[in-house]
């Protein structure tokens, strides 16, 4: 039996929902992690979903991580995949989820994966200056990780579609992401209705309120005056050294609203409204 260390706070938000800001804030006051063991655990999650990795072994992975780091705040962006099990396994922890509207979230995911594709394609043009082996390993993992959210989410295809100004090419993966957002938040709302004291939802537009809530949980002096720092995404060294602007042809929700399946849009709007009503 593995000994268990329970963090004070576990974040259940999807990626692109302020988790980097939460980590930057928390690390000022306590031991905080954000992407620790990210590739290893997400690959284990992929194998688990394929029936190639036992759930107990996957959950033990979390136990080992917490024992090794003795972390107080875990804002890892893969926690949400197993949140029901984490709620049960770490019953002494507090859980939070930052809510972002579904269309904005889908576009942000596409923009991020497109940016990743741009980075790698840029590096390939000057392969002498960069560690291409490390970059290939990283982008291979990124694209495996992307399939957890949408089977068609691939950095290169997203980037090329962005550059061609063809939103229609991205509609299938957008709808896959939207379906994921709906399914996850349905599960979350169901869990909150049965365990209302374990998960607190915060709107992404009110991260300062979240900062004050975290301040209370972490016993930080003057918690009622705390604010959340602006998010600044970190990339691996071999990637961050590539001087590529994020200014690809950015996608916006309005690009997809008139094309997306209307029933899917209505369901997403309903779930978002229900989740907003649960916001702290």
Task: Give each language-model segment a name.
Residues 1-70, 233-238, 250, 280:
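PAPS-dependent sulfotransferase catalytic core
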Residues 1-8, 148-280:
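PAPS-dependent sulfotransferases, especially Golgi type II membrane carbohydrate sulfotransferases
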Residues 11, 71-74, 200-202:
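Short catalytic-loop micro-motif centered on adjacent basic/acidic residues
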Residues 18-30, 87, 108-110, 199-222:
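PAPS/PAP-binding and catalytic site of the sulfotransferase fold
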Residues 24, 44-48, 86, 107-112, ...:
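Short aromatic-enriched loop/helix-cap "lid" or pocket-rim segments at secondary-structure transitions
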Residues 66-83, 98:
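Glycine-rich phosphate-binding loop used to anchor ATP phosphates in small-molecule kinases
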Residues 89-111, 205:
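Conserved phosphate-donor/acceptor-positioning beta-strand/loop module used by diverse small-molecule
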Residues 114-117, 123-126, 131-142, 179-182:
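Catalytic phosphate/metal-binding cores of nucleic-acid and nucleotide-processing enzymes, i.e., regions
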């Amino acid at each position: 039996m593995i000994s268990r260390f329970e963090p004070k706070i576990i974040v259940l938000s999807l990626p692109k929902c302020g988790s980097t800001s939460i980590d930057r804030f928390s690390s000022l006051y306590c031991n905080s992690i954000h992407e620790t063991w990210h590739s290893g655990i997400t690959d284990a999650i992929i194998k688990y979903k394929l029936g190639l990795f036992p759930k107990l072994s996957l959950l033990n992975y979390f136990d080992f991580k917490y024992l090794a780091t003795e972390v107080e705040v875990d804002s890892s962006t893969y926690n949400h995949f197993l949140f029901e099990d984490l709620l049960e396994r770490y019953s002494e922890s507090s859980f939070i989820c930052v809510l972002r509207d579904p269309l904005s979230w889908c576009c942000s995911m596409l923009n991020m994966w497109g940016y990743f594709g741009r980075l790698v394609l840029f590096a390939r043009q000057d392969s002498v200056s960069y560690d291409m082996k490390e970059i290939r390993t990283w982008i291979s993992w990124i694209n495996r990780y992307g399939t957890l959210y949408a089977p068609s989410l691939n950095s290169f295809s997203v980037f090329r579609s962005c550059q061609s100004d063809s939103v229609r090419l991205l509609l299938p993966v957008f709808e896959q992401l939207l379906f994921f957002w709906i399914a996850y938040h349905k599960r979350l709302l169901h869990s909150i209705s049965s365990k209302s004291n374990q998960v607190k939802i915060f709107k992404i537009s009110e991260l300062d309120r979240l900062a004050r809530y975290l301040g209370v949980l972490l016993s930080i002096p003057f918690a009622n005056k705390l604010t959340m720092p602006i998010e600044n995404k970190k990339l691996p060294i071999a990637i961050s050294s590539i001087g590529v602007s994020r200014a690809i042809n950015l996608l916006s929700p309005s690009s997809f609203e008139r094309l997306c399946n209307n029933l899917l849009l209505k369901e997403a709007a309903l779930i978002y409204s229900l989740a907003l009503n649960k916001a702290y």
